[in-house]
UniProtKB/Swiss-Prot annotation:
Its EC number is 6.3.5.7. GO terms for cellular component: glutamyl-tRNA(Gln) amidotransferase complex. It comes from the Bacteria. Heterotrimer of A, B and C subunits. Belongs to the amidase family. GatA subfamily. Keywords: ATP-binding, Ligase, Nucleotide-binding, Protein biosynthesis. This is Glutamyl-tRNA(Gln) amidotransferase subunit A. It comes from Rhizobium leguminosarum bv. trifolii (strain WSM2304). Allows the formation of correctly charged Gln-tRNA(Gln) through the transamidation of misacylated Glu-tRNA(Gln) in organisms which lack glutaminyl-tRNA synthetase. The reaction takes place in the presence of glutamine and ATP through an activated gamma-phospho-Glu-tRNA(Gln). Pfam families: Amidase.
Length: 493
């Protein structure tokens, strides 16, 4: 069965269309893999084998009839942030206990319309708030990677840790994810997978549980750049139900792979050389520059002067929006309800019991920065900084830069329950230092595996592009992937 689960989406699609394998055989292989591994990795919080088999049988019928969709018969994992009709959708929070939506998110509906098969719902940080997948009500996800000679459990990154771990461990062919401040790209870098955060508005947010509405964007995590391109083409669409989705044609991203980089300008921002950055991250960055130069791209130094303000501004804007979005969870119509002496007491007890520690922290930060006397000092200033960050990128792109190359993360994956990080949330927030600028500016960004550190753990590079120019990111990331090779964890589970 492992030979089936080792197929990329592109390879599986080819074999399915040639009738060398069936969608049901492929799905059964993944169900068996999940049964064997999930007790060790905790990547899935809900597996849907009966539904998966039914969808696979329907795919086989369409393939036989010559009516195969772009993703016909491809088994996928779905982050628990996406509404799936009649299937557990809780954003990995206790406060949404038992919630099964009567509607389907636009992103997942697009995937099913193209013939994809749902294997189940993937673990994540509660309400997508976290960088390690340790804030989930269902417990931490364990990274399938381990340092050489060590049995220490490592985090897969967050908030899309379940998505990244499942893809890396071959527990799905690909996965949906979301990115508010780095939640696709950081887990991808930590697990040796490819993750792209598209331009804000490229994918509909309808039916996706909101964290910070002006920052949230759905995207795929996949085993390689080609698979990520295939998935994004299906996920992306304009949607009348989401006024922030943009009415632009969705290109054939896969067609961009293999195109020449000759004549392209790649910007290298000096501000991303942060204090205390490990030498191996700097070395990897230099290696990425050399690969792109060898492929014919011109390397130019650029300045993004407001980068240093991005993280503090993000941790004002995102919690402010979260405090508003999460006000709707009160125990009245769905989810957890803790009885109280009156309705206000019920609200308080339900929210106290239902939200985890990190979610409560961010709600309180958001409420504080929006309160009278602090709104101008914090929230308005953070939005002004956001405008300046966006302008920095616009100036770089207007000067002729086609894409920007940076590290994806300041380190490789760290240990589960790291006391140093647990005692100081700001240290955990620093994991987003290279990724939040992209969300603040609404730009596309892709993380691609580029090497291993001294401990044998994956490291990634990030490419940032112009608005709605994901094609350039795919073709450039493909060059890095071809040079670096692909990385798969040694199986220990």
């Amino acid at each position: 069965m492992s030979e089936l689960t080792s197929l990329t989406i592109a390879e599986a699609r080819r074999k399915l269309r040639a009738k060398e394998i069936t969608a049901l055989e492929l799905t059964e292989a993944y169900i068996s893999a999940i049964d064997a591994a999930n007790g060790h990795l905790n990547a899935y919080i809900k597996v849907t084998p009966d539904l998966a088999r039914l969808m696979a049988k329907n795919s086989d019928e369409r393939i036989a009839a010559g009516k195969a969709g772009d993703l016909e018969g491809i088994p996928l994992g779905i982050k628990d942030l996406f509404a799936t009709v009649g299937v557990h959708t809780q954003a990995c929070s206790h406060i949404l206990d038992g919630f099964e939506p009567r509607y389907e998110s636009t992103v997942t509906q697009n995937l099913w319309d193209d013939g994809a098969v749902m294997l189940g719902k993937l673990n994540m940080d509660e309400f997508a708030m976290g960088s390690s997948n340790e804030t989930s009500h269902y417990g931490a996800v364990i990274n399938p990677w381990r340092a050489a000679g060590s049995n220490q459990q490592l985090v897969p990154g967050g908030s899309s840790g379940g998505s990244a771990a499942a893809v890396a461990a071959h527990l799905c062919a690909g996965a949906t994810a979301t990115d508010t401040g780095g939640s696709i790209r950081q887990p991808a870098a930590f697990t040796g997978t490819v993750g792209i955060k598209p331009t804000y508005g490229r994918c509909s947010r309808w039916g996706t549980v909101a964290f910070a509405s002006s920052l949230d964007q759905a995207g795929p995590i996949a085993r390689d750049v080609r698979d990520a391109a295939i998935l994004l083409k299906s996920m992306a669409s304009v949607d009348a139900k989401d006024t922030t989705s943009v009415d632009l044609p969705v290109p054939d991203y896969e067609a961009a792979l293999g195109q020449s980089l000759k004549g392209m300008k790649i910007g290298i921002p000096s501000e991303y050389r942060v204090d205390g950055m490990p030498e191996e991250i700097e070395t990897l960055w230099r290696q990425g520059i050399a690969w792109l130069k060898d492929a014919g791209a011109e390397i130019v130094d650029i300045s993004l002067p407001h980068t240093k303000y991005a993280l503090p501004a993000y941790y004002i804007v995102a919690p402010a929006e979260a405090s508003s979005n999460l006000a709707r969870y009160d125990g009245v119509r769905y989810g957890l309800r803790v009885d109280g002496k009156d309705i206000v007491d019920m609200y308080e007890k339900t929210r106290a019991a239902g939200f985890g520690k990190e979610v409560k922290r961010r709600i309180m930060i958001g409420t504080y920065v929006l309160s009278a006397g602090y709104y101008d000092a914090y929230y308005i200033r953070a939005q002004k900084v956001r405008t300046l960050i966006k302008r920095d990128f616009e100036l770089a792109f207007n000067a002729g830069v086609d894409a920007i190359l940076t590290p994806a993360t300041p380190s490789s994956a760290f240990g589960v329950a790291d006391e140093n990080l647990a005692s100081d949330p700001v240290k955990m927030y620093l994991n987003d230092i290279f990724t939040v600028t992209v969300n603040m500016a609404g730009l596309p960004g892709i993380a691609v595996p580029a090497g291993l550190d001294q401990k044998g753990l994956p490291l990634g590079l990030q490419l940032i592009g112009k608005p709605f120019d994901e094609e350039t990111l795919f073709k450039t990331a493909h060059v890095i992937e071809q040079a670096a090779g692909r990385f798969t964890p040694a199986r220990w589970w």
